[in-house]
């Protein structure tokens, strides 16, 4: 199997899906917990207009902070997201061919689709789904997006999310993310993943778990919540959705700090879900659907 570097994996996926006909978008410039939170998925999966895109999305999950000491769990990581709307009949075949373009021989490796229906409580999103396992390691999530913001997706969109670090661990045959070959160079130009990202991993873990100001974050959440509602009323759902994302990330920070009780957690999830819903409803209203 050809051992692509981390950046070569990204380039190969971009080229593959570009050749299929996807527009290659850029990462969204906000703190999100997954590629699904990009407005190119949340808002564009709604409505009847066709939409085929692919993009890398840096993602943050404060609760996964491990100071860079865990072999494959980080508070900051990368996903590659593909949205095909309407979902083509051969989407599974397209996905498997994308693995082949990464040098994975499907005849020599055990590729399994393990049923795992997907749900995002904060987005009010859900769909039939499968985890994709390669020789026992999860490398992707495959979902038929049926609902976002509590609104049915018509037509249903196909979503493929590649876990880039896990995929790279398998392709390169290494055990720790920090040891991944980032750029495929040798000698002085060679870079490992750890040299690029792990000092930030250490510092942000300390911030997420030790230094974050919970009182300030509680104010930030309330401010983002109020601003989101105000902007929806002002007919700018894209700007409002940014505030929804801020509220969602702030909730994740508070959760990582352990300052939210079980009961409060459920309440916060409902509040963020409401923000996502009103953004989605306003987006559809302005789209004439």
From Swiss-Prot:
GO molecular function terms listed in the Swiss-Prot or TrEMBL record: ATP binding; glycine-tRNA ligase activity
Pfam families attached to this UniProt entry: tRNA-synt_2e (PF02091)
Highest taxon of the lineage: Bacteria
Entry's EC annotation: 6.1.1.14
Reactions catalysed: tRNA(Gly) + glycine + ATP = glycyl-tRNA(Gly) + AMP + diphosphate
Coiled-coil blocks: none
UniProt-listed GO biological process terms: glycyl-tRNA aminoacylation
Annotated keywords: Aminoacyl-tRNA synthetase, ATP-binding, Cytoplasm, Ligase, Nucleotide-binding, Protein biosynthesis
InterPro entries: aa-tRNA-synth_II/BPL/LPL, Gly-tRNA-synth_heterodimer, Gly-tRNA_ligase_asu
GO cellular component terms listed in the entry, alphabetical order: cytosol
Compartments in which it is found: Cytoplasm
Listed PROSITE patterns: AA_TRNA_LIGASE_II_GLYAB
Disulfide bonds: none
PANTHER family reported for this sequence: GLYCINE--TRNA LIGASE, CHLOROPLASTIC_MITOCHONDRIAL 2, GLYCYL-TRNA SYNTHETASE
HAMAP family: Gly_tRNA_synth_alpha (MF_00254)
Family: Belongs to the class-II aminoacyl-tRNA synthetase family.
Subunit structure: Tetramer of two alpha and two beta subunits.
Name the UniProt record assigns to this protein: Glycine--tRNA ligase alpha subunit
Source organism of this protein record: Rickettsia felis (strain ATCC VR-1525 / URRWXCal2) (Rickettsia azadi)
Top-level taxonomy: Bacteria, Pseudomonadati, Pseudomonadota, Alphaproteobacteria, Rickettsiales
GN (gene name): glyQ
